[in-house]
């Protein structure tokens, strides 16, 4: 109601009066705002899926997962359908909006019995309902993954090549982005504080943010402050090209905001990416794994053991042992550790990039990581 909106505005103003002064807070410069009509990014299919149909899809995914031999229980299946509208208006004259649909199906199941139980999952999301994988294929993948994890071994502490499955390798990019936001640089809490313009990854590595990718899960014509978005190579030929900044962090650093402001419905903007990916390499996944005499193929990461200040990296992991170029027995309860600077320089991407998530990478190999086991 109008009265409720008025009350919300009055409360916001009252809280703002009590907040400590921030010399860098404020709206984005008017001359940098997007003034043209937002381009069509093909992120709304104009449809919706009924609640009854969503129920059927969730059950189909769960049933397919439970039908896999060895699956003993289910944590459930889910299906979703939604439409979101993003509208932003500022007192500097910006007033634009865009809308998009999203669909998703997932399943999570348990294989085995007693202390030997293992859990795994599968999901798929898309902007268009017609692009969504079938619930049956998603459920089958979840069940197969869970059963493959049965009977894991532990490893002794050693140094091994580690290969990251694409569904977990995106965490490498998340660690990078967290270290190059304007706020991290302004607070001097980044292990890449002095890395702008330097070789952070091996030559040939490219990491690209594509806010205008058609049907992208995070595509957007303007950022959280009204600045136009644009494609950018964050890492180009292994070199860090610059920071990701909203208006406040740009003011603090004496630089220009980059169109990477991200925000929710409350709180100030921060900085983030849209559709982020690492470009594919030249080696096939089979060749990458085939050249490893003994290593670890990681399919799940556990915990958040990344020190943003030093770059020290230590996370729980599970996956499969690589022996003589083949995936063999499942592995669980190990910790993989190194430093992100060393990991970035040693990272080699395979040629199997597929755009499935908001952040996408091919299979990744990093040699010389410490595996801490039993």
Which functions belong to the PLM regions below?
Residues 1-220, 224-227, 236-239, 326, ...:
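Active-site bordering "gate/hinge" segments
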Residues 195-374:
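Dual-mode signal for accessory low-complexity, basic/Gly-rich regions
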């Amino acid at each position: 109601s109008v009265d409720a909106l008025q009350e919300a505005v009055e409360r916001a103003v009252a809280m703002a009066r009590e907040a400590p002064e921030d010399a860098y807070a404020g709206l984005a410069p008017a001359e940098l705002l997007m003034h043209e009509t937002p381009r069509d990014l093909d992120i709304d299919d104009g449809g919706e899926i009924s609640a009854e149909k969503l129920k059927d899809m969730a059950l189909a995914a769960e049933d397919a997962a439970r039908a896999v031999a060895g699956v003993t229980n289910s944590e459930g299946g889910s299906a979703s359908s939604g439409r979101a509208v993003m509208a932003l208006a500022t007192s500097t004259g910006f007033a634009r909006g865009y809308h998009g649909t999203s669909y998703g199906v997932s399943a999570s199941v348990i294989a085995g019995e007693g202390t030997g139980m293992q859990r795994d999952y599968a999901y798929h999301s898309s902007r268009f309902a017609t692009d969504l994988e079938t619930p049956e294929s998603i459920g089958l993948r979840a069940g197969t993954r869970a059963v493959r994890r049965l009977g894991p071994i532990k490893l002794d502490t050693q140094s091994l090549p580690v290969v990251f499955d694409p569904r977990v390798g995106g965490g490498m990019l998340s660690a990078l982005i967290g270290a190059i936001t304007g706020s991290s640089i302004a607070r001097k809490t980044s292990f890449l504080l002095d890395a702008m313009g330097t070789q952070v990854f091996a030559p040939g590595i490219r990491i690209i943010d594509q806010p205008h990718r058609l049907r992208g899960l995070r595509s957007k014509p303007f950022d959280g402050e009204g600045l136009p978005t644009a494609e950018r190579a964050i890492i180009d030929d292994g070199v860090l090209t610059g920071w990701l900044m909203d208006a406040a962090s740009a003011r603090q650093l004496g630089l220009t905001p980059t169109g990477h402001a991200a925000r929710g419905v409350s709180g100030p903007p921060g900085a983030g990416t849209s559709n982020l990916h690492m470009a594919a390499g030249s080696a096939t996944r089979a060749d990458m794994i085939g050249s490893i005499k003994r290593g670890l193929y990681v399919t799940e990461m556990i915990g958040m053991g990344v020190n943003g200040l030093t770059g020290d990296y230590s996370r729980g992991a599970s996956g499969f042992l690589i022996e003589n170029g083949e995936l063999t027995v499942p592995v669980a309860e190990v910790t993989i550790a190194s430093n992100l600077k060393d990991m970035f320089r040693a990272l080699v991407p395979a040629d199997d990039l597929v755009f499935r998530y908001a952040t996408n990478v091919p299979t990744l190999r990093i040699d010389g990581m410490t595996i801490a086991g039993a």
